[in-house]
């Protein structure tokens, strides 16, 4: 597959996403946003977009390190804060997380990672309530499709400007926006434990899976056609299973329909057609 297939006109993408943020935040009746700034590329891109769309004074970045967090993560997050001139707060999650960890075996990294992600979201939404600011998400399309994230943790937000951009496209947008190169080229990691990396967890690279997902979704190619492109059947089957199995993470809880008008099914909320005053 030609790598150019994933390339976008990032100037147009920037304009679309800035307009999206401005319009959606106004619809909710807010003027400012808060987001978790990890020192990674996804949150850096969202922070930059929000700053350009709303103004740096309307963006609050919350840095939430754990005692095992990489020093680079903190340094890179602070680098972006200084570059953009946005407001920022640091809130350690160590005490809260360690209280939970007392009952979780050290080898159960999945549960521990979920606890850390959900603890960060508790802090984020509390600051959101304190500041009367909307929580903006940072999960990219690759993560959402694969279910590589924590439900009601790092996947929780009111709006997400980058959820339709593959990880490789996030890199392209980051370069267009002038994100510091060390944030773009660093090994992708949720920083949940020392030495953890996304691609080691997944067992494949973002470049590999993005090309496969693009063929599956955007090109709507069937299995046989994709395998003809050189993709192994084992890889195809594994990724397809992940996409199907994690559909529940990409939607609100399913509601059993009883009445003639059911929230989320056939009732349109007021904010869908009028601005909240």
From Swiss-Prot:
Homodimer. One of its GO terms (molecular function) is ATP binding. Pathway: Cofactor biosynthesis; NAD(+) biosynthesis; NAD(+) from deamido-NAD(+) (ammonia route): step 1/1. Deamido-NAD(+) binds at residue 118. Belongs to the NAD synthetase family. Mg(2+) binds at residues 42, 143. It is an enzyme of class 6 (ligase). It comes from the Bacteria. ATP binds at residues 36-43, 138, 167, 189. One of its GO terms (cellular component) is cytoplasm. Catalyzes the ATP-dependent amidation of deamido-NAD to form NAD. Uses ammonia as a nitrogen source. One of its GO terms (biological process) is NAD biosynthetic process. This is NH(3)-dependent NAD(+) synthetase. It holds the Pfam family NAD_synthase. CDD domains: NAD_synthase. InterPro entries: NAD/GMP_synthase, NAD_synthase, NH(3)-dep_NAD(+)_synth, Rossmann-like_a/b/a_fold. Its EC number is 6.3.1.5. It comes from Chlorobium phaeobacteroides (strain DSM 266 / SMG 266 / 2430). It catalyses: deamido-NAD(+) + NH4(+) + ATP = AMP + diphosphate + NAD(+) + H(+). Keywords: ATP-binding, Ligase, Magnesium, Metal-binding, NAD, Nucleotide-binding.
